[in-house]
Regions:
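Long, low-complexity interaction regions most often at the N-terminus
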Residues: 2-108
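Short, amphipathic alpha-helical "recognition" segments used to contact nucleic acids or chromatin
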Residues: 117-142
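DNA-binding alpha-helical recognition surfaces that contact promoter or target DNA
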Residues: 130, 160, 164, 168
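Short, charged amphipathic recognition helices of the HTH superfamily
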Residues: 133-152, 173
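Short, basic interhelical loop/turn and adjoining N-cap
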Residues: 149-161
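Short, basic alpha-helical nucleic acid-contact segments in DNA-binding proteins
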Residues: 165-180
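Intrinsically disordered, low-complexity basic tails/linkers immediately adjacent to helix-turn-helix/homeobox/MYB/SANT
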Residues: 180-190
């Protein structure tokens, strides 16, 4: 084997090893545990999460939601039993972490659950606002919200709650002088 062939062989071995290390690191960072926490959410939030993130809900790596979950995870207090699945509870996967291995840190206290619920509601509002903000100028907003619900896996019973949520968001800003929807000029035809 010539020196040139030896250099190419070494280069390929080093490259293969670096690819192996890169894949190993990325696989470890994206591992979600089989441990879950259960949250009581509004039905439309639960349906929306299941539609986009599966059941149990798995937030993307590096997401704000996973950061909040990790921040408030704690060991199960002595004498307390873990939460069990129920029809009205949403299962959310605990992200694995070197600092807080989920085999030991797999409990969210009441305030931790409120914090996670808060970031989920924020994410929902952002998605709702981003999707509907450009199409509210013309036509029936109610029909557009129904279509949005259908597109995001939310049943028809939740349509009215989501419509009211959207109107409350828009009204809160308009009361402060921030108009997020185009205002129409009044016609002055005689």
């Amino acid at each position: 084997m010539s020196i040139r062939h030896f250099k190419y062989l070494n280069m390929w071995i080093i490259r293969a090893f670096l690819v192996y290390l890169y894949n190993k690191k990325n696989m470890q960072s994206s591992i979600m545990s089989d441990f879950v926490v259960y949250l009581k959410l509004e039905p439309y939030l639960s349906q929306w999460l299941h539609h986009h993130l599966g059941d149990p809900v798995r937030f993307p790596d590096g997401s704000n939601e996973n950061a909040v979950i990790r921040r408030f995870l704690m060991k199960l207090p002595p004498g307390k039993k873990p939460d069990l699945a129920a029809n009205d509870l949403t299962a959310i996967c605990i992200p694995d972490s070197k600092a807080k291995p989920c085999s030991r840190f797999n409990h969210l206290g009441p305030r931790g659950k409120l914090a996670v619920k808060g970031v989920i509601e924020d994410l929902f509002r952002q998605n709702l606002w981003c999707d509907l903000r450009g199409i509210t100028d013309a036509g029936s907003l109610s029909m557009k919200i129904q279509a949005w619900c259908e597109m995001h896996g939310i049943d028809e019973q939740s349509h009215e709650a989501i419509r009211q949520k959207y109107y409350r968001m828009r009204k809160a800003y308009s009361e402060k002088g921030i108009f997020l929807v185009h205002r129409r000029a009044k016609r002055t035809d005689n």
